[in-house]
Protein backbone atom coordinates (compact mmCIF):
# COMPACT_ATOMS: atom_id res chain seq x y z
CA UNK A 1 0.00 0.00 0.00
CA UNK A 2 2.80 2.47 0.85
CA UNK A 3 4.47 1.90 -2.53
CA UNK A 4 1.18 2.68 -4.28
CA UNK A 5 0.75 5.94 -2.36
CA UNK A 6 4.40 6.79 -2.94
CA UNK A 7 4.05 6.11 -6.68
CA UNK A 8 0.84 8.09 -7.04
CA UNK A 9 2.36 11.01 -5.15
CA UNK A 10 5.49 10.86 -7.31
CA UNK A 11 3.64 11.17 -10.62
CA UNK A 12 1.26 13.98 -9.70
CA UNK A 13 1.01 16.42 -12.62
CA UNK A 14 1.68 19.37 -10.32
CA UNK A 15 5.20 18.05 -9.64
CA UNK A 16 6.07 18.82 -13.27
CA UNK A 17 4.96 22.46 -13.09
CA UNK A 18 7.29 25.41 -12.39
CA UNK A 19 5.82 26.64 -9.09
CA UNK A 20 6.63 28.21 -5.74
CA UNK A 21 7.53 25.25 -3.53
CA UNK A 22 6.95 25.69 0.21
CA UNK A 23 10.14 24.01 1.42
CA UNK A 24 8.88 23.30 4.96
CA UNK A 25 5.85 21.53 3.57
CA UNK A 26 7.85 19.78 0.85
CA UNK A 27 10.43 18.28 3.21
CA UNK A 28 7.84 17.35 5.84
CA UNK A 29 5.85 15.38 3.25
CA UNK A 30 9.01 13.97 1.66
CA UNK A 31 10.25 12.59 4.99
CA UNK A 32 6.80 11.22 5.87
CA UNK A 33 6.60 9.39 2.54
CA UNK A 34 9.90 7.62 3.22
CA UNK A 35 9.28 6.76 6.91
CA UNK A 36 7.30 3.51 6.39
CA UNK A 37 9.93 2.09 4.03
CA UNK A 38 12.84 3.15 6.24
CA UNK A 39 11.11 1.84 9.37
CA UNK A 40 10.99 -1.63 7.81
CA UNK A 41 14.72 -1.35 7.17
CA UNK A 42 15.34 -0.16 10.75
CA UNK A 43 16.56 3.23 9.54
CA UNK A 44 15.52 6.37 11.44
CA UNK A 45 15.12 9.60 9.46
CA UNK A 46 15.15 12.94 11.23
CA UNK A 47 14.12 16.34 9.86
CA UNK A 48 15.18 19.71 11.26
CA UNK A 49 13.61 22.84 9.79
CA UNK A 50 15.37 26.03 10.87
CA UNK A 51 13.89 29.45 10.09
CA UNK A 52 11.96 27.97 7.14
CA UNK A 53 8.43 29.33 7.72
CA UNK A 54 7.21 31.02 4.55
CA UNK A 55 10.29 29.99 2.58
CA UNK A 56 9.67 29.19 -1.07
CA UNK A 57 11.81 27.92 -3.92
CA UNK A 58 10.72 28.58 -7.49
CA UNK A 59 11.18 25.28 -9.30
CA UNK A 60 9.94 21.84 -10.22
CA UNK A 61 8.98 19.58 -7.33
CA UNK A 62 10.02 16.65 -9.52
CA UNK A 63 13.57 18.06 -9.53
CA UNK A 64 13.69 18.03 -5.74
CA UNK A 65 12.28 14.49 -5.71
CA UNK A 66 14.99 13.34 -8.13
CA UNK A 67 17.74 14.82 -5.99
CA UNK A 68 16.57 13.80 -2.54
CA UNK A 69 15.19 10.37 -3.47
CA UNK A 70 18.67 9.63 -4.80
CA UNK A 71 20.21 10.67 -1.49
CA UNK A 72 17.84 8.41 0.46
CA UNK A 73 18.39 5.40 -1.81
CA UNK A 74 22.16 5.91 -1.62
CA UNK A 75 21.91 5.90 2.17
CA UNK A 76 19.82 2.73 2.14
CA UNK A 77 22.48 1.06 -0.03
CA UNK A 78 25.23 2.25 2.30
CA UNK A 79 23.44 0.77 5.29
CA UNK A 80 23.27 -2.66 3.62
CA UNK A 81 26.96 -3.20 4.34
CA UNK A 82 27.20 -1.08 7.48
CA UNK A 83 27.64 -2.60 10.91
CA UNK A 84 25.96 0.46 12.45
CA UNK A 85 23.13 -0.59 14.75
CA UNK A 86 21.43 2.82 15.02
CA UNK A 87 21.05 3.65 11.35
CA UNK A 88 20.16 7.31 10.98
CA UNK A 89 19.59 9.78 8.17
CA UNK A 90 19.51 13.43 9.23
CA UNK A 91 18.04 16.11 7.00
CA UNK A 92 18.62 19.69 8.11
CA UNK A 93 17.00 22.49 6.11
CA UNK A 94 17.77 26.08 7.03
CA UNK A 95 17.22 29.56 5.66
CA UNK A 96 20.60 31.28 5.55
CA UNK A 97 20.53 34.84 4.19
CA UNK A 98 18.20 34.08 1.29
CA UNK A 99 19.45 30.58 0.58
CA UNK A 100 17.95 27.23 1.49
CA UNK A 101 20.78 25.09 2.82
CA UNK A 102 19.93 21.39 2.85
CA UNK A 103 22.34 19.11 4.70
CA UNK A 104 21.77 15.42 4.22
CA UNK A 105 23.89 13.17 6.48
CA UNK A 106 23.81 9.46 7.24
CA UNK A 107 25.91 7.35 9.59
CA UNK A 108 26.43 4.53 7.08
CA UNK A 109 29.73 3.33 5.63
CA UNK A 110 30.63 6.65 4.01
CA UNK A 111 32.58 7.12 0.83
CA UNK A 112 34.44 4.15 -0.55
CA UNK A 113 38.17 4.27 0.14
CA UNK A 114 38.85 4.81 -3.58
CA UNK A 115 37.28 8.29 -3.33
CA UNK A 116 39.02 9.54 -0.18
CA UNK A 117 41.63 11.60 -2.09
CA UNK A 118 39.34 12.74 -4.93
CA UNK A 119 35.81 12.73 -3.49
CA UNK A 120 34.23 15.01 -6.12
CA UNK A 121 34.73 12.25 -8.70
CA UNK A 122 31.46 10.75 -7.41
CA UNK A 123 29.61 13.49 -9.30
CA UNK A 124 30.95 12.21 -12.65
CA UNK A 125 28.76 10.20 -15.02
CA UNK A 126 29.06 6.41 -14.66
CA UNK A 127 31.17 6.69 -11.50
CA UNK A 128 30.26 3.97 -9.00
CA UNK A 129 31.79 1.92 -6.24
CA UNK A 130 28.90 -0.56 -6.13
CA UNK A 131 30.17 -4.02 -7.01
CA UNK A 132 28.80 -7.54 -7.11
CA UNK A 133 30.32 -10.50 -5.26
CA UNK A 134 32.95 -10.88 -8.03
CA UNK A 135 33.99 -7.23 -7.71
CA UNK A 136 32.37 -6.18 -11.01
CA UNK A 137 30.98 -2.64 -10.95
CA UNK A 138 27.20 -2.87 -11.09
CA UNK A 139 25.94 0.56 -10.06
CA UNK A 140 24.91 2.94 -12.84
CA UNK A 141 26.89 5.84 -11.41
CA UNK A 142 24.25 8.27 -12.63
CA UNK A 143 22.39 9.36 -9.47
CA UNK A 144 24.72 12.07 -8.17
CA UNK A 145 25.62 13.10 -11.72
CA UNK A 146 21.93 13.70 -12.45
CA UNK A 147 21.44 15.49 -9.11
CA UNK A 148 24.35 17.81 -9.89
CA UNK A 149 22.94 18.45 -13.38
CA UNK A 150 19.53 19.37 -12.00
CA UNK A 151 21.01 21.68 -9.38
CA UNK A 152 23.22 23.40 -11.98
CA UNK A 153 20.07 24.57 -13.80
CA UNK A 154 18.94 26.64 -10.81
CA UNK A 155 20.50 30.10 -10.40
CA UNK A 156 22.91 30.46 -7.49
CA UNK A 157 22.56 26.78 -6.54
CA UNK A 158 25.25 24.26 -5.70
CA UNK A 159 25.96 20.76 -4.42
CA UNK A 160 29.00 19.73 -2.37
CA UNK A 161 30.16 16.97 -0.10
CA UNK A 162 30.09 17.67 3.63
CA UNK A 163 33.01 16.52 5.73
CA UNK A 164 31.59 14.21 8.40
CA UNK A 165 33.27 12.12 11.09
CA UNK A 166 31.34 9.01 10.17
CA UNK A 167 29.07 8.17 7.27
CA UNK A 168 28.27 10.40 4.32
CA UNK A 169 27.22 14.02 4.08
CA UNK A 170 26.10 16.16 1.18
CA UNK A 171 24.89 19.76 1.01
CA UNK A 172 22.66 21.42 -1.54
CA UNK A 173 22.03 25.14 -1.63
CA UNK A 174 19.25 26.93 -3.50
CA UNK A 175 18.48 30.65 -3.81
CA UNK A 176 15.02 31.20 -2.33
CA UNK A 177 12.34 33.84 -2.86
Q: Predicted regions: what is each one?
A:
Residues 1-43:
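Conserved DHp (HisKA) dimerization/phosphotransfer helix of two-component histidine kinases, i.e.
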Residues 44-55:
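Conserved catalytic submotifs in the C-terminal HATPase_c
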Residues 63-82:
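Conserved ATP-binding N-box helix of the HATPase_c
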Residues 86-98:
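Short beta-strand/loop element within the Bergerat-fold HATPase_c
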Residues 106:
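Acidic ATP/Mg2+-coordinating residue in the GHKL
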Residues 111-126:
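Short conserved segment of the HATPase_c
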Residues 146-156:
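Conserved glycine-/histidine-rich ATP-lid loop and adjacent helix of the Bergerat-fold HATPase_c
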Residues 155-163:
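Glycine-rich ATP-binding loops of the HATPase_c
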